[in-house]
């Protein structure tokens, strides 16, 4: 019986020791703000693993917002941290230079103490994680009527003399407006290669007849 009690006490002591060790190595986070760079200390990772990072000295805004942030958070418990930061940044900008001066003096004093305590300190900002690029292409927006007219006039610069050619041109505009923008350039290039020799030798009426008989193909 005594052996069981001793085993339980030993297990409880180990758990308590682990909790205390976790509390000592837990991360400390300084809240970010819109006008200055805050220093953030996390548990060791990468090159800082196993090393104690030195806190960056506070600037004037951090000294001022240290108490203001707590005050705003108590008055507005539902407000998110990002909204509090925006409000504090706006209030800081509205202060006059005379109102800001005591906080600048306090920041200079803290920086002097920091230099004496950590003479070899160098600020090393953390690199921001790059957003992952998606392989999926966004659908292209449909071109305007003016762009479609320019494309038609560029690839088919013939004169419309009869109703047949005008109908062919109208049919081409309808297909350009209803087709997907990605397939427009490919179809026009195929037609340009197919009718390049015909447009130089034949008459506009002959070209219009070919166009109406063989409409462009638009893959779905």
UniProtKB/Swiss-Prot annotation:
<dbReference type="GO" id="GO:0005737">
    <property type="term" value="C:cytoplasm"/>
</dbReference>
<dbReference type="InterPro" id="IPR050140">
    <property type="entry name" value="SRY-related_HMG-box_TF-like"/>
</dbReference>
<dbReference type="InterPro" id="IPR009071">
    <property type="entry name" value="HMG_box_dom"/>
</dbReference>
<dbReference type="InterPro" id="IPR017253">
    <property type="entry name" value="SRY"/>
</dbReference>
<keyword id="KW-0963">Cytoplasm</keyword>
<comment type="similarity">
    <text>Belongs to the SRY family.</text>
</comment>
<keyword id="KW-0726">Sexual differentiation</keyword>
<keyword id="KW-0805">Transcription regulation</keyword>
<dbReference type="GO" id="GO:0030238">
    <property type="term" value="P:male sex determination"/>
</dbReference>
<dbReference type="GO" id="GO:0000978">
    <property type="term" value="F:RNA polymerase II cis-regulatory region sequence-specific DNA binding"/>
</dbReference>
<dbReference type="GO" id="GO:0016607">
    <property type="term" value="C:nuclear speck"/>
</dbReference>
<comment type="function">
    <text>Transcriptional regulator that controls a genetic switch in male development. It is necessary and sufficient for initiating male sex determination by directing the development of supporting cell precursors (pre-Sertoli cells) as Sertoli rather than granulosa cells. Involved in different aspects of gene regulation including promoter activation or repression. Binds to the DNA consensus sequence 5'-[AT]AACAA[AT]-3'. SRY HMG box recognizes DNA by partial intercalation in the minor groove and promotes DNA bending. Also involved in pre-mRNA splicing.</text>
</comment>
<dbReference type="GO" id="GO:0007548">
    <property type="term" value="P:sex differentiation"/>
</dbReference>
<dbReference type="Pfam" id="PF00505">
    <property type="entry name" value="HMG_box"/>
</dbReference>
<dbReference type="InterPro" id="IPR036910">
    <property type="entry name" value="HMG_box_dom_sf"/>
</dbReference>
<keyword id="KW-0238">DNA-binding</keyword>
<keyword id="KW-0804">Transcription</keyword>
<dbReference type="GO" id="GO:0005634">
    <property type="term" value="C:nucleus"/>
</dbReference>
<keyword id="KW-0112">Calmodulin-binding</keyword>
<keyword id="KW-0221">Differentiation</keyword>
<dbReference type="GO" id="GO:0030154">
    <property type="term" value="P:cell differentiation"/>
</dbReference>
<comment type="subunit">
    <text>Interacts with CALM, EP300, HDAC3, KPNB1, ZNF208 isoform KRAB-O, PARP1, SLC9A3R2 and WT1. The interaction with EP300 modulates its DNA-binding activity. The interaction with KPNB1 is sensitive to dissociation by Ran in the GTP-bound form. Interaction with PARP1 impaired its DNA-binding activity.</text>
</comment>
<feature type="DNA-binding region" description="HMG box">
    <location>
        <begin position="54"/>
        <end position="122"/>
    </location>
</feature>
<protein>
    <recommendedName>
        <fullName>Sex-determining region Y protein</fullName>
    </recommendedName>
</protein>
<keyword id="KW-0539">Nucleus</keyword>
<keyword id="KW-0010">Activator</keyword>
<dbReference type="GO" id="GO:0005516">
    <property type="term" value="F:calmodulin binding"/>
</dbReference>
<feature type="region of interest" description="Disordered">
    <location>
        <begin position="193"/>
        <end position="220"/>
    </location>
</feature>
<dbReference type="GO" id="GO:0001228">
    <property type="term" value="F:DNA-binding transcription activator activity, RNA polymerase II-specific"/>
</dbReference>
